[in-house]
Amino acid sequence: MNQKYITIQGARENNLKNISLKIPKDKLIIMTGVSGSGKTSLAFDTIYAEGQRRYMESLSAYARQFLGNSEKPDVDQIDGLSPAIAIDQKTTSNNPRSTVGTVTEIYDYLRLLYARIGVPYCPDHHIPITGNSIKEMIDKIMELPDKTRCTILSPVIQGKKGTHKDLIEKLMKEGYIRVRIDGEIKYLEELEPLDKNKKHTIDVVVDRIVKNDDRSRFHDSLETALKLSDGLAILLTNESETLFSSNYACKICGFSVPKLEPKLFSFNAPFGACPECKGLGITQKVDLSLLIPDDTKSIAQGGIHYYKNIVNTENLEWQRIHALIKYYEIDMDTPIKDLPKKKLNYLLYGSDVPIAYQLNSRSGTVSTKFEYIEGVCPMIERRYMETTSTMSREWYGSFLADAQCPKCHGARLNKQALSVLVGGKNIYEWTQMSIQEAIQFMNELELTPTQAKIAELVIKEIKNRLSFLNHVGLSYLTLDRLASTLSGGEAQRIRLATQIGSRLTGVMYVLDEPSIGLHQRDNDRLIGALKDMRDLGNTLIVVEHDEDTMRASDYIVDVGPGAGVHGGQIVAAGTPEEIMQNENSITGAYLSGRKRIEVPMTRRKGNGKKLKVVRASQNNLKNVNVTIKLGTFTVVTGVSGSGKSSLVTEVLTHGLQHALGRLRIKPGACKEIQGIENIDKIVEIGQDPIGRTPRSNPATYTGVFDDIRDLFAQTKEAKMLGYDKGRFSFNVKGGRCEACQGDGILRISMHFLPDVYVPCDQCGGKRYNEETLQVHYKGKTIADVLDMTVEEALEFFSNVSKIKHKLQTLNDVGLSYIKLGQSATTLSGGEAQRVKLASELQKKATGKTLFVLDEPTTGLHSDDVKKLIEVLQRLVEHGDTVLVIEHNLDVIKCADQIIDMGPEGGQGGGTVICTGTPEKIAECKESYTGQYLKPLLEKGEDHGKSNCS
C-alpha cells in the first residue's frame, strides 16, 4: 500500500522535544524556524539519517565499513520513508583538481567529444596534422649528427593498471629482450611482477642503432615499432625523445600527436597533463614581495629576507652567492631598489656563464669550482622540492606563492592535447566559456554529417547538463572554475542540477537552503526547478528561510518557538495560508506582514573619509572605480556572478590585507586603492568554523573562558590547593582527565562497523579529573559552567562585569541557546559567524576598522536577520565601517550606501550599475536589485520607519 504521508513519532534528536508529525509525500515541504530551533535536527538528523540508515542496513557488513557512521537517530518510529538523498552545503571539494566541469561530469563528455571528432592542428604552423610516413620519420632521424646513439621504442601500454603478465610473456616469446617500464629500461628476464594497483607505461625496445647513412635498418625497426603499438614509435637519444605517429604529425615541423583517446584530454592523467605543473595549472614560484619585503634595505642589511641571518658568514650557500655577487660587481651596501635590474636578475636567477670560485669548509678544506652558479630563486624552489624536513619545507615555502604555470599558462594540459580543436576551440578554451556561452556555442556548432552522427549522443548529454545548470541560476559559472572557490549555495545548486538531470522518481530529497547566494531575480528559476523535481513524483523537504520559496511551497513546518532549549517543538504545520493565519507562528507573522524589519529613518553620510578602488579588473571586473564612504553600513549587491566577491574579497580585502603587512595574500588586479591610511585593521567575518577540533568552543574563541578560569583560580578552594588558572584548562596536563586528554569522549574502533564514540568512563564526559572538580564557584564546577547555555551563564555571572559583558555580546547576536563548551564542529556556518561577530563586539572600537561579511544572513530566519542588522548597525555606531555582500532585501534596505553590480553574471557583469542610498537604487531602472527593493521601501513608508542610526 502506497502511503501518502511520512509519519514521525517521538523525535528527540538534539533539542527536539519528543515531537510527532505527519508530512505529505510528493510535495514541496519547507522546514523553517529561528536559528537553533531544531529544523535541521528534524530534517537532516532525524528524517534523512533514518532513511540513510535503513538503506545502509540492507548492505553487507563488509560494505558498511566504507560508508561511515549509521547511528540510529533518537526517534521512536518513522513510517512512509522513501529512499533519501541529501543535497547540503558541505560538499565543496578542496581538491585543486576538482572543477565545475569535473564535478558535473560535463568535462568527461567533452573529453569523449574531442577524442572522437577532434582535429589536431600544428600549434606553430596552424595546419591540420596528418600521419607521418616511415620515409618522413627516417628523414627526421637523418638530421641527427653521425654516431648518435638511437633507441627505437614501441609504446604498447600507456598508463594502464595491471600486472600485464600476458603481454610480457608474449614479448619474451617473440624474442624481445628489453622494455622501458615507467621510464626505466629493464631486461624482460629480470623483470619483477608489476603492481596491479598502479598505472604503468610499457615501451618495447625494438632496436638500438648508431646513426649512419644506412636507412634500411631504421626502416625495418620503425615498421616493427609502428605495428606493435598501432601506429606509434619513439626515437630516444641521449639528448631528446621524439614521438612519431603514422596517425598524426605535422608535415612541416614533424610535431606529433598520439592516437586521440579521452585520457589525452584529462589533466589528471600523465598522458594529458602538462609535464611542468602535473595538471594543476599552477606552480610554486618565489614571490619577490616575500623574498624582498623591503627593497629600501641593502643586501648587507638583510634586504633579501632569505639571507638576513647568514650574510658575511662561512655558510657554503652564502659563499656561492657571494662569489656571484663578486663576479657581477653587485654592491652589497646599495638599497636593492637602486641596484641595476640586470645585476639583480643575476643574483635572483643565476649566472649566464660559468664562474670560478673557491669554497672553504669549516674543517679547513678548500675546493675550487668552475660552474654556473644557481640564483636565489631557483635554489629556493629546488630545495623546497628536495627537502624531507617539515621545518625546512615550511621555511622555503614561506618565500613561495602560487603562480600560473609558465609552460601551459594555466591550461593544465600538454601541447598535444591543446592542439586538438572542435569548432575552432581547444578543450581548455571550451571550459573557459560560461555556461550560457557554452550553450550558445553548442547550438551553433557546425559539423560534417559524419561528425554529427558520431557525436550525436555525446552532444545531447552535454547540452542537457548545461541547460540544467542554467536552469538553477548558474549560467555565469565557467567549467574551469575550481570547485573549492564555489560558495555553499553554488555547490548545492550544482548537485541539484545533477539530480534534475537524473530524473529519478519516488525519492525523498532533503535540501539545506538552496536559495543561498541567489539574487531575487534568479529565485523564480530555482523554485521552478524544485517544483519540476516534485512533479516527477518526489518528496522535497527543504530547510529554508526565503519568503518567496515558502509562499511557493505546498506545506510548511515551523519549528520553534525559540532556539536551543526554547525550541524543538512544532509551532505550526500546514499550507502557507494556514501558517500566515497562525498567531503562534513567528514565521507566519513575517509572511503575513504582521511583523517586519523596519526601514531606518535616516541614512548615514559617513565620517568624511573614503576608500577608493581605482580601475579594478580582477576576473570579470571591467576597470571599475568604486568609492566606499567610511563610517557607514555599505552593502554590495548584484545578480550571482556579477563581480561582487571579485571586488570586495579579491580586490579590496586582499589589497588592504597586503598593504597592512600580510604579504602572502595576493591582491586582486586594480590600479590602486586610495585612502588606505584611513584603515588600521580589516576583519573578515566568514562562515568558516571557529575551530577544526572538538576542543574549540564559543567560550575559548571569545576569550570568556580565560576570565572564567581566572575566577575559579581565585576561589578559596583553589588557593588552598595551590591551583592557578592553568589547572582549569582541558588542553594541558594537570587539571584535565588524562584518560580522554580533556576531550570528554573516547573513540572505540569497531573494525567492520563504524567507530563508536562514548563518554569517557573516568571523567563521565566532564573533561577534568576529580581533583579539579573539587573546586566550586557558587556551587558549580568548571565542567558545570561549560555545560551552561549563554542564557544560563549570563544569569550565573550577572555580578562579574567582565564575564557578563562578553556573554552579553553572544546573547545580543542571537546565540543565547548555545552552550559555552559546545564543540566548534557542531556549530553551523551562521552560528560560527555570529560567534566571531560577538568576539569583535567585545573589542574597543578604533574608528579605523573595516568589517567585511559575505552573505551573513545564511541560515538566518527573518527574526534572526533583524538581530543581525542591529548588531551590524552597532559596529557602525562605534565609528567603524561595515561592508557586506548580500542578497537579502531586508539587509539591503537598511544600508546607508549600496553598490549595485551587474547587469548580468559572468562576462555580462563586472560593472557598477548604480551607487547610493537604497532609495536611489530603487529609482534606477537598470538595476535588478532596485526593482525588487522599490516595493519594500514603499511598504516601509506606509508603516513608518525606525531609527537605526
Residue ranges and their predicted role:
Residues M1-S949:
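Conserved phosphate-binding elements of NTP-dependent enzyme cores
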